[in-house]
Swiss-Prot record:
It comes from Shewanella woodyi (strain ATCC 51908 / MS32). One of its GO terms (cellular component) is cytosol. Keywords: ATP-binding, Magnesium, Multifunctional enzyme, Nucleotide-binding, Nucleotidyltransferase, Transferase. GO terms for molecular function: [glutamate-ammonia-ligase] adenylyltransferase activity; [glutamine synthetase]-adenylyl-L-tyrosine phosphorylase activity; ATP binding; magnesium ion binding. It catalyses: [glutamine synthetase]-O(4)-(5'-adenylyl)-L-tyrosine + phosphate = [glutamine synthetase]-L-tyrosine + ADP; [glutamine synthetase]-L-tyrosine + ATP = [glutamine synthetase]-O(4)-(5'-adenylyl)-L-tyrosine + diphosphate. Residues 1-450 are annotated as: Adenylyl removase. The keyword Magnesium applies. This is Bifunctional glutamine synthetase adenylyltransferase/adenylyl-removing enzyme. Involved in the regulation of glutamine synthetase GlnA, a key enzyme in the process to assimilate ammonia. When cellular nitrogen levels are high, the C-terminal adenylyl transferase (AT) inactivates GlnA by covalent transfer of an adenylyl group from ATP to specific tyrosine residue of GlnA, thus reducing its activity. Conversely, when nitrogen levels are low, the N-terminal adenylyl removase (AR) activates GlnA by removing the adenylyl group by phosphorolysis, increasing its activity. CDD domains: NT_GlnE_GlnD_like. Residues 454-954 are annotated as: Adenylyl transferase. InterPro entries: GlnE, GlnE_rpt_dom, NT_sf, PII_UdlTrfase/GS_AdlTrfase. Its cofactor is Mg(2+).
Length: 954
C-alpha cells in the first residue's frame, strides 16, 4: 500500500482543507502549538481528503492528539472488544449505552479511515479492522442488553436449567471479515433451545425473551441519535423475511432451511458466521447449517442459480439506471463473489477446505485445489482489491453507503490522490480494465450468451434499403404478401432518424432491427407486428441498455413480438414500463406463474434487493413487482398456459401480498415516529384491511382498483389507561390509526416512475366519504346493524378479510355473519335491491345499439351479482352457511346445495358469470371497451334476465 503522506495536494482538495483547517482552529485555537509541523501537515491533508474525518474532528478536536500519540500507528483488534465491554459496564441506562457505542464507533472509524486514506494499512487489514470493530460493537451491545433483559424478565433456560444465549449470525461481508467502510450489516438472530425464563417476576418463553431483546438490540445499533448511528441493520435475511419472527430457535432454523430454503439463501449462508467468542453453540449451529449450504455431491445446479441471481442484479442495475456502479455492474465486485462462491457451492460438499467465509482465503484454496489457474487467481484478486479499495475510499469520504463512481470533480481528485493516479482518465482506465477482466472470468465460470452480428440476414438489407424498388424486390423474393410492410417500416425509420439517440444507441438499433424484422416476417401480417412492437422500441430508443437486452437475447425478442401481437394491453405495458423487458429473457420463467401461496414470499425476496431505509426505492420496488407479476399472469393468460378461470385468483392473491407489505411499511414509518399503541401485544398491529367488490370476491381483473375498508381493534372502554402510543412523540391511539391509514393510502397512490401501485376506493366505509378513514371494529358492527342501507349489506356479502391478526379476522367474520343473518322482509328486500340495480343501470349504462355492456346491460355481470346478494340476504337467517363465502361461484353452489336455487339455474348463472368475466379479461387485454355485439352474448344474457325476473321481480 502506497504511503501518500508526502504527495502534494491538488488545488481543489487544498481549498476544502483550508475551510476545515479554519473551522477546527476556531474550536481548538491552541491546536497549532500542540502539533509538530509534520503532524499539522498530515491533519491538513486528511481533512482535505475526507469530509467525514474532518467533520468528526471538528466536533471532537480532543481526538486529534490521542490519534497522533500512537493510535494511528498501533492498532490491535482485540482492543475493540475489551474497550467496549469496559465502557458499557459503567452504563446505567440505554441512553448512556447508545452514547458510548456511537462515540466509540465514530472515533474508531475516523482512526481506520485515516489509516486507509493515507496508506498506513493494506486493504486486507483495513477490511479486517472494520469487521472486527463491527463485531465488537454488536457483541458488546448484545452482552450489555442480555444482562439488562435478564434483570427484567429472568434468565432464559433450556429444559435442563442451562442458560440460553442469543447467537448472532453475521452475514455477507461481515461474516467474511471483509466489511467495507460504510456498510449495512446483515444479521440473523437465533438461540439454541426453547424453554422459559427463570428468576423474573413472571416466566416468559425463551423466544419472547429474545425477540424483545433483539428488538432493543436492532434499535441500539440502527437508531439515529444526536451522536449518529452505529450501523444500519438489515434483518431481512432471516427465515420468512420481515413476516417471520425476529428470532428463531436452532430447530426452527433447521426446519426452515430443510423444507423451504431457497438457492439465494444457500448463497447467503456461504458467508454466515456466528459472531463473538467461539463456543460449543457456535459449532452446533454451523454443523446444523452445513448440509443445507454444501451438498454431499458435486452440485452443478449452483451455476444456474447464480446465473439467475446475476440476471436479477443486472435487471436491478437497468431498472434503477445505475451507471458507474463498481459493485453491481458488469465486472463489478459482486461478480468476483459469484465466481468464487459458485466453486464453493459446487465443490464445498466434497472439499471441506472450501467451506470458509473469507473470499481471499477461498480464492487461494481454489488455486491450491487446481480449480483456478494462477493467472485467473491473480487477475481476480488484483482486480477485486482495486475495486474494494476504490469502494472503501468512496464510502470514507462522507460515511455514505455508495458504490457509484463520483459525479463531482472534487471526489475524483480525492480518489486519484489516494490511489496514486494522475487523473480521472487514468483511474477510470484501471477500473475499466479490472472490471473487464472480472467479467471475462465471470462469463467463463457462470456463462453468458453471444450473438452473431446478423450481417447475412436479408432483413439487414431491408433495414438499410432506401430505394422503394429495392425494398419491394427484397420483400417479394421472400414471398411476403403485405403491401403495408415497407411503407410502414420506411415511415417509422424516418421518424427514428430524427430522434437523438447517440452513437452507441444507433449502432445497437442497427444491429437489433434485422433480427426483429426476421421475427416479423415469419408472421402472416408482418406490418401488424411492426406497428405493435415499434411502439415499444420508440420508448427505449434513448435507453440503450434495453436495446442491447433485446439484441443479446433471442428469447426476449421472440417473446416481445409474440406478446405484442397477442395483446395490445401487454404491448402498452411494455412501452410504458420498459423495465418489464427483463421478464422476457427467460421464457420458462415468464410463463411459470407464481403459485397462489407464494406471492407473499416472492415479494419479500424481491424487496431484499432494496435498502430497507430507502422508502422511495421500496415504493418503486413494490410497483415493479406488481407490474412484472401482472405481466407473467397476462402472458400465461394470452398463450393459454394459465386457465382463464384462474386469472382473477392470481391477480387477487398478488394484491393481498402487496397490501401486506404496504401496511407493514406504513406501520414501520408511523411507529418510528410515534411508537406502538400501548394496548397491543407484541408483534400485533391491531389493524385490519377488508376487501370489498372484486377484491373481496377474489375476482380482480387487469387494472382493477381496490375497494377497501380499514378497521382497528382499540376501544377506549376496554383499554382506558392505554390510549396513547409508547414512543418519544406519543399520540392518541385513534389518531395513530388515522395516520397509519393516511400513510397506507399515500404508499398506494403515489405516482413513481413505475406508476401508481393501485387506485384505492374507500367509499364503502361506514358513512362513506364523510366517515372516518379507519373505524373501530365494534363501531363497524354497530353501524352495519343499525345504520347501514340495504346496498351496504349487499356490499358486505362481497367483503373479505385481507390483512390483520387472527383475532381481528375472527371478530370481523362474526360481525359480518351477524349482519348478513339478520331477518329481513323478502318483498321489501327485493324492492330495495331492484331499485338499486335500476338506479345503477340508469347511471352507468352507456352502450351503442346492438352491443352489450358486459357489466351493466340487463343480463350482465351486475345482474348476476345482485341475484347472489339478494339470495344471501334473504336466506342467511335460515341458512347460516350462506354468510361464509364472498365469491359468487361458491355462493351459487351453496344455494344449489340448499335447494334455494334450482340446479339448472345454478349452472346457467355460473356459466354466464364465467363467460362474461372471461370476455371482460379478453377485452382488457385487447384494449377494447367492455362490450360485445349483442348476438354473441344473447344466449347467456337471456337466461340471466329470466332468472332475475323470477327471483327479484315476479
Amino acid at each position: 500500500m502506497e504511503n501518500i503522506s508526502n504527495k502534494p495536494l491538488s488545488a481543489i482538495i487544498s481549498e476544502v482543507a483550508d475551510r476545515y483547517w479554519q473551522r477546527i482552529n476556531d474550536v481548538f485555537p491552541e491546536l497549532a502549538n500542540e502539533l509538530t509541523k509534520e503532524q499539522g501537515e498530515e491533519l491538513y491533508r486528511i481533512m482535505g481528503l475526507s469530509d467525514f474525518i474532518a467533520d468528526q474532528l471538528c466536533r471532537h478536536p480532543q481526538w486529534i492528539l490521542s490519534l497522533f500519540n500512537g493510535e494511528l500507528n498501533n492498532l490491535s483488534r482485540s482492543e475493540f472488544d475489551k474497550d467496549l465491554h469496559g465502557l458499557l459496564s459503567e452504563c446505567q441506562s440505554e441512553d448512556e449505552a447508545n452514547r458510548v457505542l456511537r462515540c466509540y464507533r465514530n472515533k474508531q472509524m475516523v482512526r481506520l479511515a485515516w489509516r486507509d486514506f493515507l496508506g498506513y494499512a493494506s486493504l486486507e487489514n483495513s477490511l479486517l479492522d472494520l469487521s472486527a470493530l463491527a463485531e465488537a460493537l454488536i457483541i458488546s451491545a448484545r452482552d450489555w442488553l442480555y444482562i439488562q433483559a435478564c434483570k427484567q424478565y429472568g434468565t432464559p433456560m433450556d429444559s435442563e436449567g442451562n442458560p440460553q444465549p442469543l447467537i448472532i449470525l453475521g452475514m455477507g461481508k461481515l461474516g467474511g471479515r471483509e466489511l467495507n467502510f460504510s456498510s449495512d450489516i446483515d444479521l440473523i438472530f437465533t438461540f439454541p433451545e426453547h424453554g422459559e425464563t427463570q428468576g423474573g417476576r413472571r416466566a416468559i418463553e425463551n423466544q419472547q425473551f429474545f425477540i424483545r431483546m433483539g428488538q432493543r438490540l436492532v434499535n441500539m445499533l440502527h437508531q439515529v441519535t444526536v451522536d449518529g448511528f452505529v450501523y444500519r441493520v438489515d434483518m431481512r435475511l432471516r427465515p420468512y423475511g420481515e413476516s417471520g419472527p425476529l428470532v428463531v430457535s436452532f430447530s426452527g432454523l433447521e426446519d426452515y432451511y430443510q423444507e423451504q430454503g431457497r438457492d439465494w439463501e444457500r448463497y447467503a449462508m456461504v458467508k454466515a458466521r456466528a459472531l463473538g467468542p467461539w463456543t460449543a453453540f457456535s459449532d452446533e449451529l454451523h454443523s446444523m447449517l452445513r448440509p443445507f449450504v454444501y451438498r454431499r455431491y458435486i452440485d452443478f445446479s449452483a451455476i444456474e442459480s447464480l446465473r439467475k441471481m446475476k440476471q436479477l442484479i443486472t435487471q436491478e442495475v437497468r431498472r434503477r439506471q445505475l451507471t458507474d456502479n463498481i459493485k453491481l455492474g458488469a465486472g463489478g465486485i459482486r461478480e468476483v463473489e459469484f465466481v468464487v462462491q459458485s466453486f464453493q457451492l459446487i465443490r464445498g460438499g466434497r472439499e471441506p477446505s472450501l467451506r470458509q467465509q473469507s473470499l481471499f482465503a477461498a480464492i487461494d484454496t481454489l488455486y491450491q485445489l487446481g480449480q483456478l489457474e494462477y493467472l485467473a487467481v491473480d487477475e481476480l484478486k488484483q482486480s477485486y482489491l482495486l475495486l474494494r479499495r476504490v469502494e472503501n475510499l468512496l464510502q470514507g469520504i462522507g460515511d455514505q453507503q455508495t458504490q457509484t463512481l463520483p459525479d463531482s470533480g472534487l471526489n475524483w481528485y480525492r480518489l486519484c490522490h489516494c490511489m496514486g493516479m494522475a487523473s480521472e482518465a487514468e483511474l477510470r482506465t484501471h477500473i475499466e480494465s479490472a472490471m473487464s477482466k472480472i467479467h471475462r472470468h465471470f462469463i467463463e465460470t457462470v456463462g453468458g450468451r453471444t450473438q452473431d452480428e446478423g450481417a447475412d440476414l436479408w432483413t439487414q438489407q431491408l433495414w438499410i434499403a432506401y430505394e422503394d424498388d429495392d425494398a419491394q424486390t427484397l420483400i417479394k423474393e421472400q414471398m411476403i404478401d403485405d403491401p403495408e410492410l415497407w411503407p410502414q417500416l420506411k415511415s417509422w425509420r424516418e421518424t427514428v432518424a430524427n430522434r437523438s439517440i447517440g452513437p452507441r444507441g444507433r449502432d445497437t438499433l442497427d444491429k437489433l432491427m434485422p433480427w426483429l424484422l426476421r421475427e416479423f416476417t415469419n408472421l402472416p401480417t408482418p406490418s401488424d407486428a411492426l406497428n405493435s412492437v415499434s411502439k415499444v422500441i420508440d420508448q427505449i430508443l434513448t435507453r440503450t441498455t434495453y436495446l442491447e437486452l433485446l439484441y443479446e437475447n433471442p428469447g426476449a425478442r421472440q417473446q416481445l413480438v409474440s406478446l405484442c401481437c397477442a395483446s395490445p394491453w401487454i404491448a402498452a405495458q411494455l412501452a410504458k414500463f420498459p423495465m418489464l423487458l427483463d421478464e422476457l429473457i427467460d421464457p420458462t420463467q415468464l410463463y411459470d406463474t407464481t403459485s397462489l401461496d407464494d406471492y407473499g414470499s416472492e415479494l419479500r425476496q424481491y424487496l431484499l434487493r432494496v435498502p430497507e431505509e430507502d422508502m422511495e426505492q421500496q415504493m418503486e420496488a413494490l410497483r415493479q413487482f406488481k407490474l412484472s407479476q401482472q405481466l407473467k399472469i397476462a402472458a400465461a393468460d394470452v398463450t393459454g398456459v394459465l386457465p382463464v378461470s384462474q386469472v382473477s385468483d392470481h391477480l387477487t392473491l398478488l394484491s393481498e401480498a402487496i397490501i401486506e407489505q404496504v401496511v407493514m411499511q406504513a406501520w414501520q414509518q408511523v411507529t418510528a415516529r410515534h411508537g406502538v399503541p400501548a394496548y397491543l401485544e407484541e408483534g400485533v398491529t391491531g389493524f385490519a384491511v377488508i376487501g370489498y367488490g372484486k377484491a373481496g370476491g377474489i375476482e380482480l381483473g387487469y387494472g382493477s382498483d381496490l375497494d377497501l375498508v380499514f378497521l382497528h381493534s382499540f376501544s377506549r372502554e376496554k383499554y382506558p389507561d392505554q390510549g396513547e402510543t409508547d414512543g418519544d412523540r406519543p399520540i392518541e391511539v385513534g389518531h395513530f390509526y388515522l395516520k397509519l391509514a393516511q400513510r397506507i393510502l399515500h404508499l398506494f397512490s403515489t405516482r413513481t416512475t413505475s406508476g401508481e401501485l393501485y387506485e384505492v376506493d374507500m367509499r364503502l366505509r361506514p358513512s362513506g366519504a364523510s366517515g372516518l378513514l379507519v373505524s373501530e371494529i365494534e363501531y363497524f358492527g354497530e353501524y352495519q346493524r343499525e345504520e347501514a342501507w340495504t346496498w351496504e349489506h349487499q356490499a358486505l356479502v362481497r367483503a373479505r378479510f385481507m390483512f390483520g391478526s387472527n383475532g381481528l379476522s375472527s371478530r370481523f367474520s362474526e360481525l359480518r355473519s351477524e349482519v348478513l343473518q339478520l331477518a329481513r322482509d323478502g318483498s321489501d328486500l327485493a324492492k330495495a335491491v331492484r331499485d338499486m340495480r335500476t338506479k345503477m343501470r340508469d347511471h352507468l349504462l352507456k352502450v351503442k345499439t346492438g352491443h352489450f355492456d358486459l357489466k351493466q346491460s340487463a343480463g350482465g355481470i351486475a345482474d348476476i351479482e345482485f341475484i347472489a346478494q339478494y339470495l344471501v340476504l334473504a336466506n342467511a337467517n335460515q341458512h347460516n352457511e350462506l354468510s361464509f363465502w364472498s365469491d359468487n361461484i361458491r355462493i351459487f353452489t351453496g344455494l344449489g346445495e340448499l335447494g334455494i336455487l334450482a340446479h339448472a339455474d345454478v349452472e346457467s348463472l355460473i356459466q354466464a358469470y364465467l363467460f362474461l368475466r372471461d370476455e371482460s379479461h379478453r377485452q382488457t387485454l385487447q384494449q377494447k371497451p367492455g362490450e360485445l355485439p349483442l348476438d354473441l352474448v344473447a344466449e347467456h344474457a337471456n337466461r340471466v334476465m329470466d332468472i332475475y325476473q323470477r327471483i327479484l321481480v315476479d
